[in-house]
């Protein structure tokens, strides 16, 4: 029996050596960037803190340099860290790394829509969607009027709180929700509308769940975890409900479609579908249109809503910053005039605060994953086709050479010695290149106009001492999720 046990142990030992030897040969078959040696099957999972992957990537960059390789499950991942490496990948090699890396929790939508599309249609769908958004006012007068109108409704809702504590998640979030809803569907909602609140709840829950450790594990070990219970199932269910809503809106629009007079983005997409009805391989199917609308709806609501909410918490933490903003607003706009986007040219401090909020919170710290579309030589290394590429945005936003004391909230990061707004090329909160956020122009306008309107009419009041406000996100993964909080808004006049 003892001999048998020794024999089994030797066989296991030999098998282990053989597996490691084969794995080493596979691992070293490409001239990849350096990185920690991966274990078979598990890869480098033990080098990552699933509760804070961006921090783990920063530590690995300190050890292996600005370009390094990780293996997670069967995935080969190349991470770019720092301004030069990230800019080089996103701008100088934008075509080679324009693919969308695999995100298993959204596998159903990988070849549809805009955000998660890695199929042959994404370039054309993205290009056409961007042109429609521009036609409907992105960065122009049309969207400014939409935001100003919605700001008025938001101010009325804030007045109804009568200085009592409230959670800003959905109340403030209704403003960007209604702006993008008007662009997509020519529809706005009352702030207590059940459909509006339900959709925002789905957006909010998915943003949170996508940032949890379980989903970080699931997206890298999907083959082993897909059949287990977990929050990946909830995300898929929520995404399906959102898409069912956008599909219903598309079908509703189709019943009253007038090709000569499109009312909104949905109509424009449906008109393209009508043009392709005789095509053997149509690009604009009802399924693709519904996913495209869901992508725009989620991204156009949740990122701006979360940034505004985080911004309010930050301003309560730093009342001296809020006071300076009140002074600038009173001087440039006054108590009653409606803010306009061009006011930012005369309001460098507000412009700096809006940028610093986005820098400080680093909402999507590790970016969405890119993918190499072909074998590519990069800095002397070969990055094979299909490799997942992570251009870390937080490595730019928290670069201590560009932003001294990056862990501190300092509007001065975006002000020169004369108090004028100072642009930084490190500010890539919306990413860059082929996959840059299609709603960047809209989001910039919303953040400036909505935050300015709130502070024009109200003082912010925290329920706790500002020194006790915790700005740390409750979870960090896909995004940085702010802690829940309540506040009071006190009318200024």
UniProtKB/Swiss-Prot annotation:
Lipid bilayer topology: Peripheral membrane protein
A GO cellular component entry from the record: endoplasmic reticulum membrane
GO BP terms, alphabetized: 4-nitrophenol metabolic process; epoxygenase P450 pathway; lipid hydroxylation; monoterpenoid metabolic process; response to bacterium; steroid metabolic process; xenobiotic metabolic process
Enzyme Commission number, as recorded: 1.14.14.1, 1.14.13.n7
Entry-linked PANTHER family: CYTOCHROME P450 2E1, CYTOCHROME P450 508A4-RELATED
Places the protein is found: Endoplasmic reticulum membrane; Microsome membrane; Mitochondrion inner membrane
Pathway this chain belongs to: Lipid metabolism; fatty acid metabolism
Naturally occurring in which organism (per UniProt): Mesocricetus auratus (Golden hamster)
Keywords associated with the record: Endoplasmic reticulum, Fatty acid metabolism, Heme, Iron, Lipid metabolism, Membrane, Metal-binding, Microsome, Mitochondrion, Mitochondrion inner membrane, Monooxygenase, NADP, Oxidoreductase
Official protein name in the record: Cytochrome P450 2E1
Binding site for substrate: 298-303
Subunit relationships: Interacts with chaperones HSP70 and HSP90; this interaction is required for initial targeting to mitochondria.
Regulation of activity: The omega-1 hydroxylase activity is stimulated by cytochrome b5.
Family per record: Belongs to the cytochrome P450 family.
Protein origin, superkingdom: Eukaryota
Main location, first listed in the record: endoplasmic reticulum
Top-level taxonomy: Eukaryota, Metazoa, Chordata, Craniata, Vertebrata
């Amino acid at each position: 029996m003892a001999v048998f046990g020794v024999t089994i142990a030797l066989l296991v030992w030999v098998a282990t050596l053989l597996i490691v030897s084969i794995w080493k040969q596979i691992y070293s078959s490409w001239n990849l960037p350096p990185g920690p040696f991966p274990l078979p099957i598990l890869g480098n999972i033990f080098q990552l803190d699933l509760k804070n992957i961006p921090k783990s990537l920063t530590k690995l960059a300190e050890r292996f340099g600005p370009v390094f390789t990780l293996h997670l499950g069967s995935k080969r991942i190349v991470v770019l860290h720092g301004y030069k490496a990230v800019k080089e990948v996103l701008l100088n090699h934008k075509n080679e790394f324009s693919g969308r890396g695999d995100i298993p929790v959204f596998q159903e939508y990988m070849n549809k829509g805009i955000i998660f599309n890695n199929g042959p249609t994404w370039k054309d769908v993205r290009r056409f969607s961007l042109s429609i958004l521009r036609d409907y006012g992105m960065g122009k007068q049309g969207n400014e009027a939409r935001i100003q109108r919605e700001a008025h409704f938001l101010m009325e809702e804030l007045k109804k709180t009568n200085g009592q504590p409230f959670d800003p998640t959905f109340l403030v979030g209704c403003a960007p929700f209604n702006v993008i809803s008007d662009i997509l569907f020519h529809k706005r909602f009352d702030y207590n509308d059940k459909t509006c609140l339900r959709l925002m709840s789905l957006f909010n829950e998915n943003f949170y769940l996508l940032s949890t450790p379980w989903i970080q594990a699931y997206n890298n070990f999907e083959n082993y975890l897909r059949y287990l219970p977990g929050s990946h199932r909830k995300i898929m269910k929520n995404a399906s409900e959102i898409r069912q809503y956008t599909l219903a809106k598309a079908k509703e629009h189709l019943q009253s479609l007038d090709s000569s007079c499109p009312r909104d983005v949905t109509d424009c997409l449906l008109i393209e579908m009508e043009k392709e009805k005789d095509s053997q391989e149509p690009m604009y199917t009802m399924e693709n249109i519904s996913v495209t609308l869901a992508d725009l709806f989620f991204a156009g609501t949740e990122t701006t809503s979360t940034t505004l909410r985080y911004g309010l918490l930050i301003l309560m933490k730093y009342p001296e910053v809020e006071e300076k903003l009140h002074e600038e607003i009173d001087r440039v706009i006054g108590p009653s005039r409606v803010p306009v986007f061009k006011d930012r040219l005369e309001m460098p401090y507000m412009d700096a605060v809006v940028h610093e909020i986005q820098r400080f919170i680093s909402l999507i710290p590790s970016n969405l994953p890119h993918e190499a579309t072909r074998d590519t030589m990069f800095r002397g290394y070969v990055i094979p086709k299909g490799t997942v590429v992570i251009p870390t945005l937080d490595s730019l936003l928290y670069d201590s050479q560009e932003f001294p004391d990056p862990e501190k909230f300092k509007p001065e990061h975006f002000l020169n010695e004369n108090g004028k707004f100072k642009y930084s090329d490190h500010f890539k909160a919306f990413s860059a290149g082929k996959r840059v956020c299609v709603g960047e122009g809209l989001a910039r306008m919303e953040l400036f106009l909505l935050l300015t309107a709130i502070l024009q009419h109200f003082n912010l009041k925290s329920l706790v001492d500002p020194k006790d406000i915790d700005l740390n996100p409750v979870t960090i993964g896909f995004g940085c999720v702010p802690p829940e909080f309540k506040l009071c808004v006190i009318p200024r006049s």
